[in-house]
Regions:
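Core segments of alpha-helical transmembrane spans in multipass integral membrane proteins
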Residues: 32, 52-87
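Aromatic-anchored segments of alpha-helical transmembrane domains
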Residues: 33-36, 105-115
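N-terminal signal-anchor transmembrane alpha helix
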Residues: 18-44
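Hydrophobic alpha-helical segments of small multi-pass membrane proteins
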Residues: 101-111, 129-139
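Juxtamembrane helix-break-helix junctions at the cytosolic face
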Residues: 83-98
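Membrane-water interface at the C-terminal end of transmembrane alpha helices
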Residues: 137-155
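Non-cytosolic membrane-interface motifs at loop->transmembrane helix junctions
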Residues: 53-55, 121-134
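Cytosolic juxtamembrane amphipathic/interface segments immediately preceding
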Residues: 7-18
């Protein structure tokens, strides 16, 4: 338990990654996916609400649709800020990769829990809804692997 906490919350933050290399390699496509997702919410005219998540905006009043789009775009900005931290960790502070897998897993679990109690009405299953559980499972596996010391030495610079 002491090793886990020390790995999650290192006394010194460095660019030395302590875990299994597969978790480091998987962190790259995860970060790319997060970047794409956040940019789509910011750039898409509907914030991805109808075009991706299949929320029936065309059945809403103009004001209600505009509010949903604004919330999606603001959510995209929040996601982009978190994504920039993921990029910073990947490039400069790799010792924090285990912590960021934990943050991602907690965020995924929280999103699923909130969605269970406050579901979003969509015409079809939104990509986010269908990918949440696989991403949570993958994040937990990568978290476990990132907490296991690397046998071949540390991955850095």
């Amino acid at each position: 338990m002491k090793h886990i906490l020390a790995t999650l919350f290192p006394k010194q933050i460095t660019n030395t990654y302590p875990g299994q290399k597969i978790a480091l390699f998987v962190f790259v496509p995860l970060t790319l996916m997060l970047t794409f997702r956040s940019c789509m919410h910011l750039i898409a005219p509907d914030g991805g609400a109808q075009s991706i998540a299949t929320i029936p905006l065309d059945t809403y009043s103009a004001g209600a649709a505009a509010n949903v789009i604004a919330i999606f775009s603001q959510w995209g900005l929040s996601q982009l800020l978190l994504t920039l931290l993921f990029i910073l960790v990947l490039v400069r502070y790799r010792s924090l990769i285990p912590l960021f897998y934990l943050i991602f897993a907690v965020e995924m679990f929280g999103r699923m829990a909130v969605g269970h109690f406050k579901p979003v009405v969509t015409l079809e299953t939104a990509p986010g809804a269908s990918s949440n559980m696989p991403l949570l499972i993958a994040a937990l596996i990568m978290l476990g692997l990132s907490l296991m010391p690397s046998k071949s030495g540390d991955a850095s610079d």
